[in-house]
A protein has these predicted regions:
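Solvent-exposed alpha-helical segments and adjacent loops
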Residues: 1-434
Length: 434
């Protein structure tokens, strides 16, 4: 290979492995092999579709995801309880009867996300769902398959007939109505989706900062990190920038990936909560720590409460995420280790799905015993929301303020209506007087 030349610049969120978010997508585009959307058998195997999404899709006030589903199936011999069950991320959504008299098999659905939906009985019957970077949509076709009976004197032979089910390639799912907005730092989206670097699939918005004389372990860590991001996006990192001069980062509008050490220009104790220096480091512990990555503590809970000095005789590594001091829409992730064995632990952790699942928050400490993550320090936001969505987002974590805001809005609306009625009434009276 003599070289790579980019013929057309990449666009944000156009990674080959991600579902398009600028338009509706057909199921044919989501297939990874030819026969994926069909199944056969007495009880057909489930049909599954992977939905790999950008982790910064803003779904806080989403009513659901629109899906236009077209499907075909072998009709049951009689009208019975045969059905199609739809599940998302192993959570049941809804079932539809396989009616033997049905002519057109087309459904226009709205997949619920975050909040439960109300059915016609005004009861919450659909569970709240949460979309992640990797999701699985599953269709189970359940056939009753009645078998004729016999007796000792009258033996009946029966040949089971296979059932065939197909999800149409022209079925569509639409994520184009949602904004891109996320709270960071969150090492979970870096470890499992390569975000924010994977926003540009070719890493054209990424600047890698390496030591002037990187060790073999640091090079291995770098290659593992870039390879992991490429496996998530489906595209090689052909346009990333790399430097060994920490002073160059001030003039770059890019997300920074630091390998081995933090440049002196970025050392800010208010943003960096862990420094790996030889075998000694310190960690600021928050007021309250949550083991579940899905729980985001409030500002008070994230405030450092104690400072713990750690002296470790064993190897140690760390992954740290914080906001770039040069651009409030850019992020920094540092991959640090204290020794060659620490680099090996870090590289292995980035290659281990179980250890990556344990990374979240702003700091992940990696030792021989495993991965420990903390969420501490300042939160910043990357992406764009319209002003009205910003208001709802700001009030979402403050229900009392939301109630006060709603009450004031109702009072103002009532006052406006009252004034309008008064004006109309006066006009009518003046016309009557004339």
């Amino acid at each position: 290979m003599d070289g790579i030349k980019t013929l057309q610049p990449r666009q944000p969120y156009d990674a080959p492995n991600w579902v398009r978010t600028d338009r509706s997508v057909t199921f044919a585009e989501l297939k990874t092999y030819e026969q994926q959307l069909q199944s056969s058998g007495l009880v057909p195997d489930a049909i599954t579709v992977a939905l790999n999404l950008p982790p910064d899709l803003y779904l806080l006030r989403a009513n659901g995801i629109d899906m236009d589903l077209k499907y075909r199936y072998t009709m049951p011999p009689v009208k019975d309880s045969s059905r199609m069950d739809i599940s998302l991320n192993d959570q049941f959504l809804q079932s539809f009867s396989l009616n033997s008299s049905q002519d057109v098999n087309k459904l226009i659905l709205r997949l619920p996300v975050l909040q439960g939906l109300l059915d016609g009985k005004s009861e919450v019957t659909i569970p709240a769902l949460r979309l992640g970077a990797v999701n699985q949509l599953r269709f189970d076709f359940q056939y009753m398959n009645p078998m004729p009976g016999g007796s000792i004197d009258n033996c009946i032979t029966f040949q089971p007939v296979q059932n065939h089910v197909v999800i149409g390639d022209d079925s569509t799912i639409d994520f184009s109505k949602y904004y891109h907005f996320i709270a960071l730092p969150d090492l979970r989206v870096f470890a499992n989706a390569g975000f924010p670097y994977s926003r540009m699939a070719d890493l054209s918005d990424t600047l890698v900062v390496v030591p002037k004389a990187p060790t073999q372990g640091q090079v291995a860590t770098l290659l593992q990190a870039l390879g992991g991001i490429g496996s998530q996006t489906g595209l090689a990192a052909i346009n990333l920038q790399m430097t060994d001069d920490g002073n160059q980062i001030k003039n770059k509008d890019a997300d920074l990936l630091l390998i081995g050490a933090i440049p002196s220009s970025l050392k800010d104790d208010t943003k960096i909560n862990l420094l790996v220096e030889a075998t000694k480091s310190w960690v600021k512990m928050p007021m309250r720590h949550y083991d579940l990555a899905s729980i985001y503590p409030d500002d008070e809970a994230r405030t450092p409460n104690t400072r713990t000095d750690i002296t470790s005789s064993g190897p140690m590594a760390a992954v740290i995420g914080f906001q770039s001091p040069y651009n409030d829409q850019r992020s920094v992730v540092a991959l640090l280790a204290d020794s060659p064995r620490g680099n090996e632990l870090l590289t292995n952790a980035l290659n281990d799905s179980g250890k990556r699942a344990a990374m979240f928050g702003s700091v992940a400490v990696i030792r021989e015993s495993g991965v420990n993550s903390l969420r501490v320090g300042d939160i910043y936001y990357v992406g764009h929301l319209p002003w009205f969505e910003r208001i709802w987002f700001a009030l979402s974590n403050h229900p009392i303020l939301l109630a006060i805001f709603a009450a004031i809005s109702i009072v103002l609306l009532a006052w406006v209506l009252w004034r309008m009625l008064r004006i109309i009434s006066r006009r009518r009276l003046s016309l009557d007087d004339e």
